[in-house]
């Protein structure tokens, strides 16, 4: 579990450093411009680290399931080799995910001077500002995202269904409280990350007001990561 915590914390730092330093530099210099290559780099890194975050949250849900439902077999099932392989598999999935999205952005054409109503280059806003037809991009992005993140969400839900049913059968109140507190902190992060993330990408093509999507983006790229250590320490 601590291996996943450490990697999740490192990934959270990477997500924050992808967006906040550039935003602060823009505020200090009063220059809101960003190069095309720099914008693509932000899209790539955000999608990559966001995908890794999703994979890690799903893996941690499975880890909690094994720890609570099969405590005597935990060290056998979640051995170091298996945990490392899960992390490598998560990074590999995230890499393929972000490469797909970057390739889909590269085939689009943009005007010479385009204003992004956001504090960083977010994929949904970039596609919305293209000068070419973006229907295929939206269709493929939503299809792939639903399949990619949907599998993680279903896995998390199934893990917690079995976990909660196992906790409710516990006779000791102390063990039940400890199990619920551990699961509750993880579920809080999951709800905050997926809720705001899906809100941004679903509402972006449907609304003309960027303010709401910017607030949601701050929640899943900054607030979730900064509050993660505090939530897990409760």
Swiss-Prot record:
At the top level, the lineage of the source is: Eukaryota
Cell compartment(s), UniProt: Cell membrane
Spans through the membrane: 1-11, 43-62, 85-105, 139-160, 183-202, 213-234
| Sequence ranges on the Extracellular membrane side | 12-42, 106-138, 203-212
Q: Which SUPFAM superfamilies does this entry report, sorted A to Z?
A: Family A G protein-coupled receptor-like (SSF81321)
Q: Can you supply a Gene Ontology BP term from the record?
A: signal transduction
- Provide the disulphide bond pattern: 39-121
Give the membrane topology.
Multi-pass membrane protein
**Function, in words:** Possible taste receptor.
Please identify the protein, giving its name as recorded.
Answer: Putative gustatory receptor clone PTE38
Write down the species: Rattus norvegicus (Rat)
């Amino acid at each position: 579990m601590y291996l996943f915590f450490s990697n999740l914390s490192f990934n959270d730092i990477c997500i924050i450093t992808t967006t906040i330093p550039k935003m602060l530099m823009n505020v200090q210099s009063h220059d809101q411009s960003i190069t095309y290559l720099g914008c693509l780099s932000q899209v790539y890194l955000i999608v990559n680290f966001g995908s890794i975050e999703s994979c890690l949250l799903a893996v941690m849900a499975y880890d909690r399931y094994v720890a609570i439902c099969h405590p005597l077999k935990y060290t056998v099932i979640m051995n170091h080799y298996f945990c490392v392989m899960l992390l490598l598999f998560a990074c590999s999935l995230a890499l393929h995910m972000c490469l797909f999205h970057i390739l889909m952005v590269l085939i689009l054409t943009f005007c010479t001077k385009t204003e992004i109503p956001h504090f960083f280059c977010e994929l949904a806003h970039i596609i919305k500002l293209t000068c070419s037809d973006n229907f295929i991009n939206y269709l493929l992005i939503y299809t792939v995202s639903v399949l990619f993140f949907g599998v993680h969400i279903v896995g998390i839900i199934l893990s917690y269904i079995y976990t909660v049913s196992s906790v409710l059968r516990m006779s000791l109140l102390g063990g039940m409280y400890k199990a619920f507190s551990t699961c509750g902190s993880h579920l809080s992060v999951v709800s905050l990350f997926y809720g705001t993330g899906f809100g941004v990408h679903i509402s972006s093509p449907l609304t003309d007001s960027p303010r709401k999507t910017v607030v949601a983006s701050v929640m899943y790229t900054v607030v979730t990561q900064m509050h993660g250590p505090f939530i897990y320490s409760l």
